[in-house]
Amino acid sequence: MLLLPREIFVISSYVKFRIKIMKDFHQLLLNRRSYRKYKEQELKAEDVKLILEAALVSPSSKSTMGWEFIVVEDKETLEKLSLCKEHGARPIAGCKLAVVVVADTTKSDVWVEDASIASVIMQLQAADLGLGSCWIQVRQRFTADGVSSEDYVREMFGIPEQFGVLSVM
């Protein structure tokens, strides 16, 4: 393929712009961490909206967008949610807000992957805003009493059986 001088300029300008963005994104990836202890400060409504919008525009197989997000802010509910599995969920009790990630298993056979992508996108958006987050796995986990973590969360929020509960962010 032969490139004319104008095309070379356009391509090189695009590449320079893209490299700058990718360096910023790479830095975001390097700096992102899972946080299990949180500050007492309130979250800005605009930040929460941005995080949820990011998840809502995340890619999904065949654009099924079968995921849904349950935002939890009530302290008592967060405390109860922190008991959804035997180990690793207690940090939920100390956060200001949690997002339960669920997906309609009848819409896509790859609902786990779709919901996982949305979850990671939420984490990256939170990190970009300077906010900490942590993925709390729910699917295929159990409470201290041996109850399925999915069933525990499903019962807490009245989630229909057709929805799989993947995680809490």
What are these regions (language model features)?
Residues M1-I21:
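N-terminal amphipathic/basic-hydrophobic helices that include classical n-h-c signal peptides
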